[in-house]
Each structure stands twice: as structure tokens, then as C-alpha cells.
Amino acid sequence: MVGEWVSFPTDRETIQGVFQRIGLEHGGEYFITDYDSSLPLSEMLGEYENLNELNYFAHNLQSVAADGNLEKFSAALELGDNTGRLKDLINLTDNMDAYTWLPGITTENSYGQYLVDACEAIPVLLEHPEIEPYFDYEAFGRDTTINESGTFTKDGYIVQDGNFTEEYHSFEDIPKEYMITPEVSGEALTEAAAEMSMML
């Protein structure tokens, strides 16, 4: 079998050149042997992913990074919701506004303090600062985390506190400029199948 690394996002001309070099210029079957990314995506993406969807996802990731939300996206991956399929990951890139990301808030205690200080969640503490030493910030942060199903990462706190307003359903939703190939079957592999590795 012949294989080649492909960096995504890519374009139609590049992927056609790859197909020619690995023997798929007249159609055939492929599978993806590996993924390389600064994000923990390799466990979430499979060997039979659609190349047009991968390209669309990679373009969306570029937009997420350009908006300064790559750290937030990475934290949302750790949260573990909406990561089961490539379709879910595409929807995740389109709905970063549904998440609140608090960089630097990495413990229940620091989250409890944030809620009290920044959000004024416990007005009585502002009115009577003398009782603050007796307040259990850690327990408050822990209970709030449980109630809102948030999670701590090594870099901060992430919670989904909004609804998805954009939804990707199928290939028909991919803008034409991100389509790089007519579908080449990624199923029913044979010994003559070609292999590709993706860099996202």
C-alpha cells in the first residue's frame, strides 16, 4: 500500500495530486492511518472519515483560531460533549458562543471565589465582608460545577451554558469552496486500498 501525509485544510488541486500519487486517480478506496494535531483529535476521528467533511472542519478550526477561541475549543473537547463524530466536531466549531471559558480558573476554590467576586453570586458577602473568612469557596465552587456540569482543565474552567444555534447536518451543508473531491469510497477496504495520514 502507498501512503502520504496531507495537511488540512487543503484544496481540490492538492488532493487530486495526492490521489494520483497513491493510485486513486481513477477512483478506489482509501483509509486514514493517522492524524497529527496540536489538539486531542486523534481519538475522535476515524479511519473512514469523509475528506470533504475533514476539510470543512479544518477550515472551521482556522476560524476558531483566528477568533482567539482555540484554547476554548480544546477545553470543550475535554468537556466531552458533542465530540462523538466528525459531524459533532463541526457543530462544535460553529457554536463556540454556547460555552463559557474561564482561563486560569482551575480549582473548585478559585471558581467559588470567581463567582463571589466577579459575578457577585453571594450579595451578603459584599454587604458583610466580616463573614467572608467563614465562607467555604471550595464547596460553593464544587456544588456549582456539579449543578452546571462544567469541568476543569489544566488551563481553566469550561461550561456549556447556551444552546447550539448553528447545526451541520450532512454533506449538503458544506460550502462549495470547501469541497475538495467527489466522494471516494472509504468503506469495504481491499488489499489495493491506499492509505493517507492527516495533519489538522
Label for each model-derived stretch:
Residues 1, 38-42, 165-168:
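Short, surface-exposed beta-strand/loop "edge" segments at domain boundaries and coil↔beta transitions
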Residues 13-86:
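Structured domain cores in non-transmembrane regions
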Residues 5-8, 44, 169-170:
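Short amphipathic beta-strand/extended segments with alternating polar/hydrophobic composition
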Residues 1-13, 194-200:
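Short, extreme N-terminal segment that most often corresponds to the first beta-strand
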Residues 111-113, 117-185:
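Mixed-charge, low-complexity intrinsically disordered segments
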Residues 2-7, 29-34, 149-160:
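Ordered hydrophobic segments in well-structured contexts
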Residues 83-120:
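Extracytoplasmic/secretory-pathway segments with low complexity and glycosylation-like composition
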Residues 136, 184-200:
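Non-Sec secretion/translocation targeting segments of pathogen effectors
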